[in-house]
């Protein structure tokens, strides 16, 4: 600030302006000297000490509280350096961190603006000051307005200046020098209400801001400038004079009213041969002649100058406190209104009838900063994992898992219930909530399943964008997986066609510009082989062979190529048929992309670093000595991570009622966890979480809710969620919502089978209490399964129009008798969040209940024991029967050190058993284990009870046949 005043005083235009001065002829009077010196030094010291004390007090409760000022100095002007040192000293005296960044005078405006933008995005910096003057090639207005107005501790941003000038305006910051002047007046107990105040000077730095402050204090303000006539006469009427014109000793004694208050802002250097420097510092007021007529007067130096720096420190502290308060606030979700229709229109019509919020608004309501958001159009965005650093001190919100009973082929509405529940919590109960769901695969969307966005008035919007491509994460998985597959086959080809170890090694580690270097992945392989050499030319022939030859056994390769389309013709293919491949053919096949182990790794990784580590650990097969070969051995870890660098960032969308949804990852539920990502859950829980008060260890406010879902029924998806996902995340749900339907329970009670694409038998559309009463056994078993993990259960009866109240009462009674905390009916499909309010209240209550969580099995027990635990405790079976092929693989995994991993069992989702025809709760069956495979990077083994197709096919009439696009680009017929 002082540098700006120096500029003002040295302004040639200002100095040479012709001021019309008409001095008053007044008779000399006798005046007893009663003036008081308003010392800025003393008050500034007091302000710095108070700031120091306040910061220390806050740090006792919140150790991470650290007000920080960043000063950018462009060039090396001596006067600027002096002022910067003054600000640094004042900051240190006040316990404010001050970071000074000196930039070269020749920096371009583009470079400086980028630097400012980066600091704006840095949450550890609370105040940003650009030291003026800047070199002439830099536009000061552009530069100062580039500073985030919430960090503009100088108060120069157009927002702060404009708000200060408005009546009732609310600037974030007041410019430091005017602010200091007001503090001096306040210290002297000068009453401003109704007083005449004259401001000499109209600069945007001092004159205009101080005039606004005086007006806001109800003073009558006159601003004088170089064109003001009769200036002495105007000043002589003033009760308060603010001199900020930049002319040395300009204001004379005969201008001043007896008893006036004079604040001298001027900083001017005039010749003085008695001084070592040859000049002395004076103000705009002729202090010696004026002081005798004043009641209060500020000296120069020692008046306003120290206050400028003190108020800068005060503004930085204010900025830090504001940010701290903002960080503690619970997100406020502003819901979109729903206009319900009956009968309920199609899902796509409902989606298109709603006008979504811009995704930036959804993010802002959640407290996500703009630099933490990457926009993909108007309604989709990615969230940067860097947000964790800002939110690390927050306690997690409440964590709710939505699971289901054993379903019919039509599905029982878990996703719809998830959306309805968060709409009810956020839009109707005022509790900020986030739905976390999987990203749907294109294959089923264009095949027979249709979309996966929920349905009716409880869905993700825009649903066509949700179901088609989204932000390209699945395509990134495809590219990474197929690069790995190509690298494996190519490595085998090159090893087979280059018999000479030395020649092969030279091509594997080539010279570039005459220098041979190991890549980072090669260095890691050398370390695993205990070859501690950095010079490629230093390896012995034996070491060269060990390093270069992977000797992959093609019969053991587990990596297949992937595509995100249902294409049955790719289930088995032969590669290498071209003449260029020299007869090296191999039978392999394609999987659907979401079946790739990379998708499971994406879902289970907590960070980019962990994802890279998991990718490197992926076992792609074995060598001829039956030793595992990893992605790290292939040298693909870095490249695969690079392809998935953006995919690790969760996607943000919204529900029909404008409540936030995170869409991330989508591992194949048949052979994987079938749940959305760990990183999305961790992020969402922080966003709706609460800060704790260190004094009483209580939350400052009630936390919000994160609602996610598990694939298939609880016995499959729920068990995997707890035993695999929760082991990876370290999280445990506070409650489980178990979705049940009258339709599914009738199916388990003996009603005819339900088939997709066919009309429901009349047993499902007419009341039949007997079927329901028999079928609730499946519901009871699933409740028992959940209670095995020690988590409270809420049963949500997803109501259909044909359900009778008597049927629903049978379900409620059975659920409560089985140990559910609540059993409620939910009508969210027809009514959106309004129809799930009772469910939302039940969930809130359930999350407050105590939980006694435990895993189903000890991972250090044998593979066979873990399989038996799942079959007996979750499915109700008697024992397992392991095929010879499966047993051979189990023995191999044990020898390779993979026996202590959790287990995922791939089986039918239509029965608790392995046989889809066995409804209800079958007992005493022997569960077959036909094969066991390993996803070492993802961190689990998976056993197959039946032949699982890892790439679906298309039916005679497939979903894609109805899809059209009109001339406006609107997609029709997809849903």
Swiss-Prot record:
UniProt-listed Enzyme Commission number(s): 1.5.1.5, 3.5.4.9, 6.3.4.3
- GO BP annotations listed: folic acid biosynthetic process; nucleobase-containing compound metabolic process; tetrahydrofolate interconversion
The entry's localization annotation reads: Mitochondrion
Q: Which GO terms describe its molecular function?
A: ATP binding; formate-tetrahydrofolate ligase activity; methenyltetrahydrofolate cyclohydrolase activity; methylenetetrahydrofolate dehydrogenase (NADP+) activity
Transit peptide: where? 1-34
GO CC, sorted alphabetically, is: cytosol; mitochondrion
Q: In which pathway does it act?
A: One-carbon metabolism; tetrahydrofolate interconversion
Please give the superkingdom of this protein's source. Eukaryota
Region annotation (Methylenetetrahydrofolate dehydrogenase and cyclohydrolase) ranges: 35-343
**Domain remarks:** This trifunctional enzyme consists of two major domains: an N-terminal part containing the methylene-THF dehydrogenase and cyclohydrolase activities and a larger C-terminal part containing formyl-THF synthetase activity.
Relate the protein's function as given in its record: Mitochondrial isozyme of C-1-tetrahydrofolate synthase. The trifunctional enzyme catalyzes the interconversion of the one-carbon derivatives of tetrahydrofolate (THF) between different oxidation states by the enzymatic activities 10-formyltetrahydrofolate synthetase, 5,lO-methenyltetrahydrofolate cyclohydrolase, and 5,lO-methylenetetrahydrofolate dehydrogenase.
Protein name stated in the entry: C-1-tetrahydrofolate synthase, mitochondrial
Organism source for this protein? Saccharomyces cerevisiae (strain ATCC 204508 / S288c) (Baker's yeast)
């Amino acid at each position: 600030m002082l540098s700006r005043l120096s500029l003002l005083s040295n302004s040639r235009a200002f100095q040479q302006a012709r001021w019309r001065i008409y001095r008053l002829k007044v008779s000399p009077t006798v005046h007893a000297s009663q003036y008081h010196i308003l010392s800025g030094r003393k008050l500034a010291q007091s302000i710095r000490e108070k700031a120091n004390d306040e910061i220390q007090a806050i740090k006792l409760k919140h150790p991470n509280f650290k007000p920080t000022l960043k000063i950018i100095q462009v060039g090396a002007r001596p006067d600027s350096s002096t002022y910067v040192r003054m600000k640094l000293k004042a900051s240190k005296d006040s316990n404010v961190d001050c970071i000074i960044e000196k930039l070269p005078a020749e920096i371009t405006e583009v470079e400086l603006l980028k630097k400012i933008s980066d600091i704006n995005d840095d949450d550890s910096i609370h105040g940003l000051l650009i030291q003026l003057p800047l070199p002439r090639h830099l536009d000061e207005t552009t530069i100062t307005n580039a500073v985030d107005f919430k960090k503009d501790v100088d108060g120069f941003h157009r927002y702060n200046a404009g708000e200060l000038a408005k009546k009732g305006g609310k600037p974030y910051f007041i410019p430091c020098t005017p602010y200091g002047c007001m503090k001096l007046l306040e210290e002297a107990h000068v009453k401003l209400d109704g007083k005449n105040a004259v401001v000499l000077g109209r600069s945007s730095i001092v004159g205009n801001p101080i005039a606004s402050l005086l007006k806001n204090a109800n003073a009558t303000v006159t601003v004088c400038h170089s064109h003001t006539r009769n200036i002495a006469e105007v000043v002589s009427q003033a009760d308060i004079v603010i001199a900020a014109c930049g002319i040395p000793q300009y204001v004379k004694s005969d201008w001043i009213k007896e008893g006036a208050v004079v604040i001298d802002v001027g900083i001017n250097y005039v010749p003085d041969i008695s001084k070592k420097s040859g000049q002395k510092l004076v103000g705009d007021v002729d202090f010696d002649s004026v002081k005798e007529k004043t009641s209060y007067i500020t000296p120069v130096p020692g008046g306003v100058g120290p206050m400028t720096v003190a108020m800068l420190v005060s503004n930085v502290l204010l900025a830090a406190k504001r940010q701290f308060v903002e960080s503690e606030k619970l997100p406020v979700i502003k819901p979109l209104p729903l206009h319900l229709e009956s009968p309920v229109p199609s899902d796509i019509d409902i989606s298109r009838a709603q006008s979504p919020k811009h995704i930036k608004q959804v993010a802002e309501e959640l407290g996500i900063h703009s630099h933490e958001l990457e926009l993909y159009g108007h309604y989709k965005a990615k969230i940067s994992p860097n947000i964790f650093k800002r939110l690390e001190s927050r306690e997690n919100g409440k964590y709710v898992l939505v699971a289901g009973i054993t379903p019919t082929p039509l599905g029982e509405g878990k996703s719809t219930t998830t959306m309805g529940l968060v709409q009810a919590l956020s839009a109707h109960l005022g509790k900020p909530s986030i739905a976390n769901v999987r990203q749907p695969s294109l294959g089923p969307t264009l095949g027979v399943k249709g979309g996966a966005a929920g349905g009716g008035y409880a869905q993700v919007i825009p649903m066509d964008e949700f179901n088609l491509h989204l932000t390209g994460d699945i395509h990134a998985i495809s590219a990474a997986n197929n690069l790995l597959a190509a690298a494996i086959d190519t490595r085998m080809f090159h090893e087979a066609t280059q018999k000479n170890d030395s020649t092969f090694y030279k091509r594997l580690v080539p010279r570039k510009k005459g220098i041979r270097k190991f890549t980072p992945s090669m260095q890691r392989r050398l370390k695993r082989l205990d070859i501690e050499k950095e010079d490629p030319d230093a390896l012995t022939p034996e070491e060269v062979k060990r390093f270069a030859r992977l000797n992959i056994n093609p019969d053991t390769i587990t990596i297949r190529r992937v595509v995100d389309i249902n294409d049955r013709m790719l289930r088995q293919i032969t590669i290498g048929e071209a003449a260029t491949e020299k007869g090296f053919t191999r039978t392999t096949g394609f999987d659907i992309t979401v079946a790739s182990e990379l998708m499971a790794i994406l879902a289970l990784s907590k960070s980019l670093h962990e994802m890279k580590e998991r990718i490197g650990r992926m076992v792609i097969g074995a060598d001829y000595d039956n030793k595992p070969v990893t992605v790290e051995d292939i040298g693909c870890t870095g490249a695969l991570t690079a392809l998935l660098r953006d995919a690790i960032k969760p996607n943000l969308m919204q529900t029909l009622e404008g409540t936030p949804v995170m869409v991330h990852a989508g591992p194949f539920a048949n052979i994987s966890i079938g749940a959305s990502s760990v990183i999305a859950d961790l992020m969402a829980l922080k966003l709706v979480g609460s800060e704790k008060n260190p004094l009483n260890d209580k939350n400052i406010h009630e936390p919000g809710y994160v609602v996610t879902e598990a694939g298939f029924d609880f016995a499959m998806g729920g068990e995997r969620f707890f035993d695999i996902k929760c082991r990876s995340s370290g999280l445990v749900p506070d409650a489980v919502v178990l979705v049940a339907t009258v339709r599914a329970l009738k199916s388990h009670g003996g009603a005819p089978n339900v088939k997709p694409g066919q009309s429901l038998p009349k047993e499902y559309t007419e009341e039949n209490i007997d079927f329901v009463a028999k079928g609730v056994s499946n519901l009871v078993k699933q409740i028992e399964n959940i209670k095995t993990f020690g988590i409270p259960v809420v049963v949500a009866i997803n109501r259909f129009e044909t359900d009778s109240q008597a049927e629903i009462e049978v379900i409620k009674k059975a659920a409560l008798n089985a140990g559910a905390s609540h059993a409620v009916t939910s009508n969210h499909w027809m009514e959106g969040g309004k129809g799930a309010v009772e469910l939302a209240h039940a969930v809130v209550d359930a999350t407050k209940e105590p939980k006694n969580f435990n895993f189903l099995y000890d991972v250090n027990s044998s593979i066979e024991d873990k399989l038996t635990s799942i079959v007996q405790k979750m499915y109700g079976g008697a024992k397992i029967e392991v095929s010879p092929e499966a047993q051979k693989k189990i023995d191999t995994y044990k020898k390779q050190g993979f026996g202590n991993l959790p287990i995922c069992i791939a089986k039918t989702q239509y029965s608790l058993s392995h046989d889809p025809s066995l409804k209800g709760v079958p007992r005493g069956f022997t569960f077959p284990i036909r094969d066991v495979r390993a996803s070492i990077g993802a961190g689990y083994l998976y056993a197959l009870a039946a032949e699982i197709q890892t790439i679906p096919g298309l039916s005679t009439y497939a979903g894609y046949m109805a899809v059209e696009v009109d001339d406006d680009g609107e997609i029709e017929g997809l849903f």
